Amino acid sequence: QGKVNTDQPLTVASLAGIVLDDEQAVLTGSWQRSMSTKSYIGSGYQHDSDQGKGDKTALFQTPAGLDGEYEVRFAFTPGSNRTKTLPVTVSHAAGKTTIIIDQTVVPPIKNRLISLGRFLFKASERAQVLVETTATTGHAIIDAVQFLTVAEADEQTQIAKGVRDEKRTAAELKELKSQLEKLTARQPQRQLVMSVQEEEEIGDTS
């Protein structure tokens, strides 16, 4: 069973690179729009209602050709009723590559995106990502596709690493503070006993 994702929606404009929202996909078959799971990109996402398997597809394609190597990321909202075997095919300069996605698991990037890999593209051809529902069980979800240059992808990875490091440091400091408070509470209170010593009287000298 996938984790419940409580994140709020992200705007397309807040993401780097070229982002194609589900509204821009060329669809075959009947897809259902939804905003039930809030971790979507744009104005919502779509699902196949767990019906009509094999008859429904979604094609994401860039407005123009891409020149060079790009990292391709696929966005979806996870859930326990999602498919574990969604085939997503990237068409690139060297041919086609199909990746099988488990949509019950929270995506690792921003809790929304999963990397499909890095591929070379030709400037003369539009990049395409095809989502199929053949042989899937459970709801198939489409939300967005992101294309990042290698430099953009590496930068995003470093930013994410920095955020993770900050969170880890904060968590470690919190844990150390908690341990210190526990140790302090365990120490017995030592009573300070103060005594007054009488000064020796100095007699008169003869």
Description of each model-found segment:
Residues 1-16, 104, 115-117, 135-206:
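Substrate/cofactor-recognition hotspot
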Residues 11-38:
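Predominantly extracellular/luminal regions of secreted and cell-surface proteins
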Residues 43-64:
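Short beta-strands within extracellular/lumenal beta-sheet-rich domains
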Residues 58, 62-80, 145:
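A short beta-strand element within beta-rich, extracytoplasmic domains
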Residues 69, 83-87, 126, 142:
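Exposed beta-strand and adjacent loop surfaces of beta-rich binding modules
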Residues 70-74, 116, 125-134, 145:
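Extracellular beta-strand-rich recognition modules
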Residues 79-98:
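Short, surface-exposed beta-strand/strand-loop-strand elements in extracellular ectodomains
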Residues 93-124:
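Extracellular carbohydrate recognition and processing domains
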